[in-house]
Amino acid sequence: MFRKIAAAVSAAILSVSLASCSMTEKSVTEVVNNTEVPPKMLFLGDSIAAGYGLEGYTADDNYHCRSYSNILREKYNEELRGKCGHTMVNKAVSGATSSDLIGQIQSGQLDSDLADCDAIVVSIGGNDLLGIMLDLFNSMGISESGSFNKDNFDFFSAASMFLSINSDVDKALDQFELNIKTIAEELDGRTEGTVYIQTLYDPLEYYSKFKRVTDFSDEKIGRLNEIITENSACGYKVIDIAADFEGKAGSLTNIADLDIHPNAKGHEVIAEDVDAAFRATGFTYTTTVYGDRQLSAEGRIVIGGIIAAIAFLAVVGAALLLRKKKDN
């Protein structure tokens, strides 16, 4: 009988060694790492974010111009190399208004990018006022080609136009305030990432000789930026681009050519502002760390059974030896 028990134990030990792969496992630990910049960032909004006017920009390609999103992509690819890597997605659409952005978000086409995004940067609002402002430009004798005949400038027509479009601009701003709240709400329901909304710089400050123009744009664009700032409690952080462009429209935009968009230098300034906002926030990413191989739960059960069997074998063996001595 002792030999049978010993054989059974030996067989059990053999089976454990044959099944050693399932008897052991490596411990797995998820480690949260801190980083100053986002592993994945998404840019939304209008032509400013798209990079309109820069060399390499096309209407269907936001990735081959030196826009602020691409400047940061290059920077973060290097900074996060060998760590978690970096991904930049730019879904900005030139000409988009705040209503257009709402439609884009609600369509669901951004859901997959929003779901795993760490930072979402939005540039929106300029086109909400652009059409109205262009009417004003036309009334001043500024053509679509960018020419401006000062000799034929009609001050009275311009003044009349200011009065007539003022209410239109105010209505557009009222709608923008409703839209910015909707944008924040829609994004909040689709992402765990941090949302940032940029303020809008005032390119019309360039026309400093025409105080009525600069006063009007300062008031209306200033109000738009107040709306952005005052509604940040809806769930986003504000990146104050306007502050760093103030007094520099001539050097940071193409307004001298009747193009309100940032030039290459302007995009570098925006990139610095966005980068500073990211670093003030901070982000995390998770890595998996594997420890030394150890017994799995199944292995502990089996080994426990074998130990019990060996102990039982020892007891039986001792009893048999004792009985044998008594028989002798």
What are these regions (language model features)?
Residues 2, 314-328:
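C-terminal membrane-anchoring or membrane-association module
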Residues 40-45, 49-51, 87-92, 118-123, ...:
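Structural recognition of the beta-strand scaffold that forms the well-ordered cores
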Residues 302-320:
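Selective detector of the "anchor" transmembrane alpha-helix that sits immediately C-terminal
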